[in-house]
């Protein structure tokens, strides 16, 4: 079996743009393996040269030409990185010229990346949403729950917390979540805490076999992790969702990104940035 191809994400900011687009492209090659290296804040010629050395060293040691996804605004730094012995996809170089031509004007660098804290409204909205999600994780508090944009419901380990945090970080959505415990599942009614907010509820379900595997890692050989327990809880949760007309989605084969977009569309939520 051949060794994994080395992939470098190089950015003059956080690296999130290079990673997100790069990963979306690499995911189309599920039969290949990759070893990833992320280099954020490459914003000086010295840092750029250091990264070039690492890329070239990887080429020599691995024997395969690395792949580099580059998100760098500065022309000089881009020129230095271009000297690396790698197959390079430079997002600004590839798309900026096309956009300038279409808009019939030259781009003017703002000096701040789109992840910069300089955009205070965006930053504040993100932090408020994250704090809200953390304060309303796992049904710990109903204080100000009426301010939630959406309340996720599901059995333990069905993916509620990561989905809430992704909605908060990526879209500024105030997402709370409530764990369905056996007492809730035995009742014909909605849990008391979330009942007043019926219109904000969205359910998460999961295949029992996948749930059992996740729970087994958390609490090995416990009743909580038994397949019969998982099957019963999942079936009861889905019955509750259907009984009360609560929309729900299966998290088994969905990434958190896909799940978040599905929830936005299903609940007609308006992103804050």
UniProtKB/Swiss-Prot annotation:
Pfam families: Kinase-PPPase
InterPro entries, A to Z: Kinase-pyrophosphorylase, PSRP
Annotated catalysed reactions: [pyruvate, water dikinase] + ADP = [pyruvate, water dikinase]-phosphate + AMP + H(+); [pyruvate, water dikinase]-phosphate + phosphate + H(+) = [pyruvate, water dikinase] + diphosphate
Positions of ADP binding: 154-161
Keywords associated with the record: Kinase, Nucleotide-binding, Serine/threonine-protein kinase, Transferase
Domain of life: Bacteria
Enzyme Commission numbers on file: 2.7.11.33, 2.7.4.28
Root EC class: transferase
The protein's role, per its UniProt record: Bifunctional serine/threonine kinase and phosphorylase involved in the regulation of the phosphoenolpyruvate synthase (PEPS) by catalyzing its phosphorylation/dephosphorylation.
Family in the record: Belongs to the pyruvate, phosphate/water dikinase regulatory protein family. PSRP subfamily.
Full protein name: Putative phosphoenolpyruvate synthase regulatory protein
Organism (species): Neisseria meningitidis serogroup B (strain ATCC BAA-335 / MC58)
């Amino acid at each position: 079996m051949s060794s994994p191809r080395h992939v470098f994400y190089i950015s003059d900011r956080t690296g999130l743009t290079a990673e997100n687009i790069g990963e979306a492209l690499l995911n189309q090659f599920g039969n290949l393996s990759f070893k990833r290296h992320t280099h954020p804040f490459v914003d000086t010629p010295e840092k750029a040269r250091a990264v070039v050395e690492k890329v070239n060293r990887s080429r020599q040691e691995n024997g395969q030409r690395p792949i580099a996804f580059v998100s760098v605004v500065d022309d000089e730094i881009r020129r230095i990185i271009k000297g690396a012995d790698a197959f390079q996809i430079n997002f600004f170089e590839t798309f900026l010229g096309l956009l300038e031509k279409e808009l019939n004007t030259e781009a003017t660098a703002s000096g701040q990346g789109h992840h910069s804290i300089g955009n205070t409204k965006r930053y504040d909205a993100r932090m408020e949403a994250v704090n809200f999600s953390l304060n309303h994780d796992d049904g710990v508090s109903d204080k100000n729950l009426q301010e939630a944009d959406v309340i996720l419901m599901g059995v333990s380990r069905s993916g509620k917390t990561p989905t809430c945090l992704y909605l908060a970080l990526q879209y500024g959505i105030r997402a709370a979540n409530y764990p369905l415990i056996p007492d809730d599942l035995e009742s014909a009614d909605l849990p008391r805490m979330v009942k007043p907010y019926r219109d904000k509820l969205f359910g998460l379900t999961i295949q029992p076999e996948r749930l059992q595997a996740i729970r087994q890692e958390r609490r090995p050989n416990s009743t909580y992790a038994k397949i019969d327990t998982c099957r019963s809880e999942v079936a009861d949760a889905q019955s509750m969702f259907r009984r009360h007309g609560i929309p729900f989605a299966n998290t088994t084969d969905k990434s958190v990104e896909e799940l978040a977009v599905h929830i936005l569309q299903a609940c007609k939520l308006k992103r804050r940035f």
